Amino acid sequence: MSLTEAQQSRIATVACPFCATLNRVDLARLADRPRCGECRRPILLDRPIAVSDANLERVLAGTDVPVMMDGYADWCGPCKIMAPVLDDFARERAGEVLVIKLDTDRNPVTTQRLAIRAIPTLIVFRNARETARHAGVTSRQQLDALVALEPRVT
């Protein structure tokens, strides 16, 4: 007998926002308020989590649920418009989608590797592979549509 999707483990690998230690978190147990294994501070997955050149690949490889990455810059007006929309999306979809953010100015290696040429750029990953991309400001409904897209056959 196969497990239903609801019974399957949903794991995310996230960097602690306080000490940068990578932690594997069972998304089915978010109500238990996961804590960092190193510094013991809370890992809050109801908001976008910052990633960097140093840890993005490990976060993507260690996460079983879709990952939506926001490529942004602090000085970008449209990025500031998108920030509260992404905050709401992360809160509403916590446990189903991991929302991460990459500062494109501070992480040029990943910015170049992912060919981010406009900001904000939203990229959806499944199993560490890009499945959808959108450049520019978008609506909350479009975020759901981006995550719902089936992976491209390559």
Language model features with spans:
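Short pre-active-site segment immediately N-terminal to redox-active cysteine/selenocysteine motifs
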Residues: 18, 64, 71-75, 118
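Thiol-based oxidoreductase modules, predominantly thioredoxin-like and allied folds used
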Residues: 51, 71, 86-109, 116-119
